[in-house]
Amino acid sequence: MVNEISPRTLVLLAVTCSLLVLYFSTRERQPVMPRELPVVKAKSYHFEDIIVEGRKKYPDRPYLAVNNRHSFVVYPPSCFDEIKRLPEHSASAKDFFHTMNAGDWTYVGHETTPLLKTIIADLTRVIPARVNKRQQDTRMAFESIVGYAPEWKEIGLLMTTFEIVAKINACAFVGRELGTNNKWVKAVMQSPLVIHVAVLIMNACPALLRPLLAPLAFLPTKMNQWDMRRLLTPMLQEDMAIFKETKDRSELLRPKQNGKIPLTAMLLSRYKQGEATIRQLIVDYILISFDSTPSTASALYHVICELAAHPEAADVLRQELDEVMVDGKLPQTHLQELKRMDSFLRESFRLHPVSLFSLQRVLAKPVKLSVGPTIPAGAIIAVDAAAINRSPSLWKDPDEFDMNRFHDLRQVPGNENKFHLLNTGSDSPGWGDGTQACPGRFFANSTLKIAFAYILQNYDVKRKEGSSPPKMTPLANGTWAPDDKAAALFKSRN
């Protein structure tokens, strides 16, 4: 007589079957790579050492870089222009960021065409008119976060720069009232942090269990989004009502010096009827806050680190500010007049990029470039940006910080419009390039220059005696995590 299956066994079988169904229905299907593509692999959670080895072994051809979590087909810098010309329907940057940040749970990579056009065109157009208002927002942010320091005061840089940028940008996007609301600022700061932690948890979890664990891992992300939705809804309802009642909507979109940037009106004017629901606008605001805050904060963090390491630069930069500013006000432009500051910022950006890579793309179709085999759909491709930023053939003493590097290069006849912080190209990989370049780089440029100008005018900055330069940590997706222990000494000048 056959023994009956116990209820406990049945439950165990049911759970196992459910896990298998979830796993096979949601797992990432890895593309089959061509055999002639060399592989550089290491039992490591990051790409740093893998890239160094790959660059040495295969300087002029692509290779497959494999760490414990991701596989990227890495192309040499010579392929930069080829990759930037690949259309989005063949090779997508949005899909890359969606994949790396679990976009189905976080919204990342869900940027709509109207949102991107709003950032590229409408937001960029209003930046010059907003400079002096954003100077006021910057003063408010620094006074509330750093404050007056009659004696040398140690400031932890990571969270300080994060909060400063979050406040400055929030005042522009959602207005001073909500932008100074600690609940909103905290939610903006929490957004990338809870996503990062959730992705780390998922990466460490066995693949079979990830579908089951995801709702729990991303619960803090969802709760943070609910908080942002609750705070945004009254403002958006008011904005939508004003837009609906206004006959001359071009007046709403006209660049103005005061008030918040009319981001809601910009979005409503670009969405088709029925698309611009309040839910869609909430997602757009969450995304623009996520996309604009951590990367700009990281750049400001490194700028302060370099200023602390090179305090002699401060007087040179202050003299330039004195020549450009009138009654304490910066010009209402994209601030290209600040040529030495621009050079300082670009040099910091060169030495301290966000990622080891540039032009990261997920392929929707097979792609064959001038070197290497055909790469199948589903693969992630990228350019070795570190090989550009630290190239001895491009830059003299590439591992050294030279605040005048790009200022001096622009003095060469024919270079007047080259080597700016905002420039994209094969010698400036930080913003990406082509039709999928960073759409918010003009806004980031403005934020950085206004914040840096405030620091130079109001504080002396130096390293703490005996401290070491910040130590960056490479992450699984190729990005760098700033040193959370880095600090600088601030002292008020007046």
UniProtKB/Swiss-Prot annotation:
A GO cellular component annotation in the UniProt record: membrane
Residues with glycosylation annotation: 445, 477
Bilayer-spanning residue ranges: 5-25
SUPFAM superfamilies registered for this protein in UniProt: Cytochrome P450
GO molecular function, one term: monooxygenase activity
Family matches, as InterPro entries: Cyt_P450 (IPR001128), Cyt_P450_E_grp-I (IPR002401), Cyt_P450_sf (IPR036396)
CDD domains xrefs: CYP503A1-like
Chief place where the protein resides: membrane
Subcellular location: Membrane
Superkingdom of source: Eukaryota
Biological process, per Gene Ontology: secondary metabolic process; small molecule biosynthetic process
Co-factor(s): heme
UniProt EC number: 1.-.-.-
Keywords attached to this entry: Glycoprotein, Iron, Membrane, Metal-binding, Monooxygenase, Oxidoreductase, Transmembrane, Transmembrane helix
UniProt similarity note: Belongs to the cytochrome P450 family.
Role this protein plays: Cytochrome P450 monooxygenase; part of the gene cluster that mediates the biosynthesis of a family of the mycotoxins cytochalasins E and K. The hybrid PKS-NRPS synthetase ccsA and the enoyl reductase ccsC are responsible for fusion of phenylalanine with an octaketide backbone and subsequent release of the stable tetramic acid precursor. The polyketide synthase module (PKS) of the PKS-NRPS ccsA is responsible for the synthesis of the octaketide backbone. The downstream nonribosomal peptide synthetase (NRPS) amidates the carboxyl end of the octaketide with a phenylalanine.
Protein known as: Cytochrome P450 monooxygenase ccsD
